[in-house]
């Protein structure tokens, strides 16, 4: 028997079946680095319209986690897809390098500044530590396949950036947004520093809940207000609080002007409460026998005075809109030094902003004999005992409530009035302008707009000063006596910035005031405070984007971070940009959810459900991680687990196998010589290219809308359904058995070439390593890298006016599906082995029959059977299977007649009819020794 294997065009490619990504990717990265791929892309895109995604800087502390990976991969997908869409999209990664976490790490190793090291040496150690952390994180980000200017990232500790941060503050001061005040701010006693809003988390805490009586000074005046005379015992106004430790700072009692307040007789005293809360208060304090003697509006009680239970002074009743009937007594303990609402109303009434608490959280000397030097969180019991002793405590119980805590230490924080510098939200209209700017930004998902609007509308002034060592100095001089800023502040700040640009922030601390102020130096002091690190990152639109040459003066198009950054980076950037320039720093803001495990639980080392990106890359490869990110809807929580990553790996194999099939069947194809014109191609091949064209339209729309999970779903549908289970199956016969250089085969290869050119580009933003690998195996002249090009423009489709248009082939797909069901049943019943052992008769109603008949003998190639006949629907025998999908179709199957051709495996009656090739069928004889078969349709 002759061996006809050599006459077949069997698929052949060096592109490996297995991805082996974990081993292969590092080699590709080395090539990208050696070639300066990022530089090649920049050169190729020079002069194109720009798209700038400004990198929100991760903190330079610790290894990257799965959340970092999600963030950087999403950014990279966008930057690469924009490049393919014809944009110049430079990506400059950055790091946030100042601040407390780095200080704490350095303190752990070297002690606090001033112990073993001077403050200058301590800062140098912080800089050194941050640089080491940047290097570690950079390696992992590069390993993810993220392309960017990794050799020249921006660091907030770069001297030039530090100088520009000072300049940003100068601009804000020049625009009139800065003010100083002894204002209550979030204060962490462990950090010994003020905290920004974004540095506060809320946890449940158990505190004493107390009702306290403040006795009236002028009892008769109160009786007159309530129009009563028969009161038994003293009259008191009752407050409720869960922070007894703040009572030493009490300077007033706030009541609501429009609420009704009742005078209630209980035993041998009378108390004043909001009328609507009388019943709940009586239940709480265990009183069943009480009488309401009279009621008045809160406004009637304004400025009446009451005795502080133990501090020895009296306090006024004042009117406040912040008083509610949600809980308590309707009268609010007011300590202007310990709360923002209290502070605001205190300013209105000219109250003292008392702050009896030191930076370490202990009462200052002279507060109260039994409280001096006591930690405030240990003082609650002492205060409760004091109130009991004075007869002012009506009730005490334990209560669990949500309490602000430090994001680093997870310990409770306090509000504490300290002299601080603030960016005012209202003195120059910053709040109003910011709210206006928010409306001009596209928020993705769109609920982000309402979220940040609410935060901006309700946020307090921004406390930007910190009492730390490792941070950008505020670089201000204030008068020793008046505490006013120097009249030449902006000029002086520019002088400081110039020095910092050369020597870094240490230049400020080394500066002798006389160098800049001359004879005035004795009248001024250098402000020792540093800037909140959120000011560092929030000003990068100015300190980085505005000055980097590759951004050419363009503002950022997009900021992309986790959804917690509405109150973090998005907020600080908006505040600073609006305060400096009167406009938002971004056009689009995209947020992604947090990563959770397969059961939807938060990632936690204690639970042991964390997924390490380094482990995933070492086991499965970065492309699997990238595919997981892209295929997950990032607008909600993003679930990741070994099982979920395994599913991503399965999807990857389907895409890789499709690419490999295309490459293997393009063996020997030279697009410069072998391309078949569209009008001369087999109709099915033109349909396949049209499928790619339709898929590309969907995929490009999804990339444009940042719907990457839609990109992956459409890509999978194209590979699995349109190609894998239909087209690629059908063409194997023609591809393998036709004459190598025949139009029938070259038509098929032309289609595969167009599809491969499109597919490799669709993959590139997501499966960057695999796309680069595929690119290297594609035939024809091309640029070295897929990333320098644009979406493929060589696709075309069938015209609707053609008889065999897309609708025709869509119906054929359904017919093929129905035939497959019948064949599968026949195989299960052991009637046939494979589909080529079968012959089918399609009993069809006239319209469908005409379409099927139009394919002639080529219908069998579409159905993958050795025979296919079309007959009238009404002639169908009883055993013909009625289609569930196509009402006008029945399918009958029989065993194919004739012998099996060993070359094409079809069963035909003409095997051995040609003496010279006695073992093969007539079609194969033509393909081996004749002019080759002609294919028109399939």
Curated annotation (Swiss-Prot):
| Positions bound to Zn(2+) | 901, 904, 921, 924
Give the signal peptide, or none: none
Q: What is known of its domains?
A: IleRS has two distinct active sites: one for aminoacylation and one for editing. The misactivated valine is translocated from the active site to the editing site, which sterically excludes the correctly activated isoleucine. The single editing site contains two valyl binding pockets, one specific for each substrate (Val-AMP or Val-tRNA(Ile)).
Question: What does the annotation say about its assembly with partners?
Answer: Monomer.
Where on this chain does L-isoleucyl-5'-AMP bind? 561
Main subcellular location of this protein, as a coarse class? cytoplasm
* GO BP field: isoleucyl-tRNA aminoacylation
Binding of ATP: at which residues? 605
Q: Does the keyword Magnesium apply?
A: no
- Span of the annotated motif 'KMSKS' region: 602-606
Motif 'HIGH' region location, chain numbering = 58-68
MF terms in GO = aminoacyl-tRNA deacylase activity; ATP binding; isoleucine-tRNA ligase activity; tRNA binding; zinc ion binding
Reactions catalysed: tRNA(Ile) + L-isoleucine + ATP = L-isoleucyl-tRNA(Ile) + AMP + diphosphate
Function comment: Catalyzes the attachment of isoleucine to tRNA(Ile). As IleRS can inadvertently accommodate and process structurally similar amino acids such as valine, to avoid such errors it has two additional distinct tRNA(Ile)-dependent editing activities. One activity is designated as 'pretransfer' editing and involves the hydrolysis of activated Val-AMP. The other activity is designated 'posttransfer' editing and involves deacylation of mischarged Val-tRNA(Ile).
Could you tell me what this protein is called?
Answer: Isoleucine--tRNA ligase
Question: What gene is this protein a product of?
Answer: ileS
What is the source species? Shigella dysenteriae serotype 1 (strain Sd197)
What binding details are noted for the cofactor? Binds 1 zinc ion per subunit.
């Amino acid at each position: 028997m002759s061996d006809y294997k050599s006459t077949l065009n069997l698929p052949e490619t060096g592109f490996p079946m297995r991805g082996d990504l974990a081993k292969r990717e590092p080699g590709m990265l080395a090539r990208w680095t050696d070639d300066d791929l990022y530089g090649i892309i920049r050169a190729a895109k020079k002069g194109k319209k720009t798209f700038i995604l400004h990198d929100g800087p991760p903190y330079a502390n610790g290894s990257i986690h799965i959340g970092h990976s999600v963030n950087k991969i999403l950014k990279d997908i966008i930057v690469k897809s924009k490049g393919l869409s014809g944009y110049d999209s430079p990506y400059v990664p950055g790091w946030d390098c100042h601040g407390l976490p780095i200080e704490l790490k350095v303190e752990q190793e070297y002690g606090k500044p001033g112990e073993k090291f001077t403050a200058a040496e301590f800062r140098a150690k912080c800089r050194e530590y941050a640089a080491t952390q940047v290097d570690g994180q950079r390696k992992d980000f590069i390993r993810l396949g993220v392309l960017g200017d990794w050799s020249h990232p921006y660091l907030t500790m770069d001297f030039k950036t530090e100088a520009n941060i000072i300049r940003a503050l100068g601009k804000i001061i020049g625009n009139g947004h800065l003010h100083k005040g002894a204002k209550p701010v979030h204060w962490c006693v462990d950090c010994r520093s003020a905290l920004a809003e974004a540095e506060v988390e809320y946890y449940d805490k158990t505190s004493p809940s107390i009702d306290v009586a403040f006795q009236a000074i002028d009892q008769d005046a109160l009786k007159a207000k309530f129009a009563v005379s028969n009161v038994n015992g003293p009259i008191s106004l009752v407050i409720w609080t869960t922070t007894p430790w703040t009572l030493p700072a009490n300077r007033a009692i706030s009541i609501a002007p429009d609420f009704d307040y009742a005078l209630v007789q209980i035993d041998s005293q009378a108390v004043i409460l909001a009328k609507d809360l009388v019943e709940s208060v009586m239940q709480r304090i265990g009183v069943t026998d009480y009488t309401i003697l009279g009621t008045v509006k809160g406004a009637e009680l304004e400025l009446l005075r009451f005795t502080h239970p133990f501090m020895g002074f009296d306090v006024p009743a004042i009117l406040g809109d912040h008083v509610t009937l949600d809980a308590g007594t309707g009268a609010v303990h007011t300590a202007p030094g310990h709360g923002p609402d209290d502070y605001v109303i205190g300013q209105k009434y000219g109250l003292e902003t008392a702050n009896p608490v030191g930076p370490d959280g202990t009462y200052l000397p002279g507060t109260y004999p039994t409280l001096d030097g006591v930690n405030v969180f240990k003082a609650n019991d002492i205060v409760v005992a004091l109130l009991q002793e004075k007869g002012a405590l009506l009730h005490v119980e334990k209560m669990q409530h949500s309490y602000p805590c430090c994001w680093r230490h997870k310990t409770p924080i306090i509000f504490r009035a300290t002299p601080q510098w603030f960016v005012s939200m209202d003195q120059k209209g910053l709040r109003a302008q910011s709210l206006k700017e928010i409306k001009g930004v596209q928020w993705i998902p769109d609920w982000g707009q309402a979220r940040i609007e609410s935060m901006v509308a309700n946020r307090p002034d921004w406390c930007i000063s910190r009492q730390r060592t490792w941070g950008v100095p505020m670089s201000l001089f204030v008068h020793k006596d008046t505490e006013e800023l120097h009249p030449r502040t902006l000029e002086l700040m520019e002088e400081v910035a110039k020095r910092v640009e050369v020597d870094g922030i240490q230049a400020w601390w080394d500066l002798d005031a006389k160098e800049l102020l001359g004879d005035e130096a004795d009248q001024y002091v250098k402000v020792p405070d540093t800037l909140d690190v959120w000011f560092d990152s929030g000003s990068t639109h100015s300190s980085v984007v505005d000055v980097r040459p590759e951004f050419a003066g363009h503002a950022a198009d997009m900021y992309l971070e986790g959804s917690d950054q509405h109150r973090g980076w998005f907020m600080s950037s908006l505040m600073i940009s609006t305060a400096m320039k009167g406009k938002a720093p971004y056009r689009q803001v995209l947020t992604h959810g947090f990563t959770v495990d397969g059961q939807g639980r938060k990632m936690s080392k204690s639970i042991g459900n964390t997924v390490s990106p380094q482990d995933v890359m070492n086991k499965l490869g970065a492309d699997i991680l990238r595919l997981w990110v892209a295929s997950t809807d990032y607008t909600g929580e993003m679930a990741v687990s070994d099982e979920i990553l395994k599913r991503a790996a399965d999807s990857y194999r389907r895409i890789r196998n499709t690419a490999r099939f295309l490459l293997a069947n393009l063996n020997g194809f030279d697009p410069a010589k072998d391309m078949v014109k569209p009008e001369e191609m087999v109709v099915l091949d033109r349909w396949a290219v049209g499928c790619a064209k339709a898929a590309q339209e969907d995929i490009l729309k999804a990339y444009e809308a940042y719907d990457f999970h839609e990109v992956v779903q459409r890509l999978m549908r194209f590979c699995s359904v349109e190609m894998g289970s239909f087209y690629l199956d059908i063409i194997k016969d023609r591809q393998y058995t036709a004459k190598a250089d025949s139009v029938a085969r070259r038509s098929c290869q032309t289609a595969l070439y167009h599809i491969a050119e499109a597919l490799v580009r669709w993959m590139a933003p997501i499966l960057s390593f695999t796309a680069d690998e595929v690119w290297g195996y594609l035939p024809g002249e091309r640029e070295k890298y897929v990333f320098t090009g644009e979406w493929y423009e060589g696709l075309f489709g069938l015209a609707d006016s053609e008889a065999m248009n897309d609708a025709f082939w869509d119906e054929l797909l359904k017919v093929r599906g129905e035939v497959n069901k019948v064949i599968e049943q026949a195989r299960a019943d052991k009637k046939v082995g494979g589909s080529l052992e079968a012959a089918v008769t399609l009993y069809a109603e006239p319209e469908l029959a005409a379409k099927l008949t139009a394919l002639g003998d080529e219908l069998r190639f579409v159905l993958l059977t050795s025979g296919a006949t079309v007959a009238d629907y009404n002639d169908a025998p009883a055993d013909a299977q009625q289609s569930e999908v196509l009402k006008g179709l029945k399918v009958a199957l029989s065993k194919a007649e004739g012998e099996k051709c060993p070359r094409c495996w079809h069963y035909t009656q003409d095997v051995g009819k040609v003496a010279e090739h006695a073992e093969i069928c007539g079609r194969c004889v033509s393909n081996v020794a004749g002019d080759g078969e002609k294919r028109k349709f399939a």
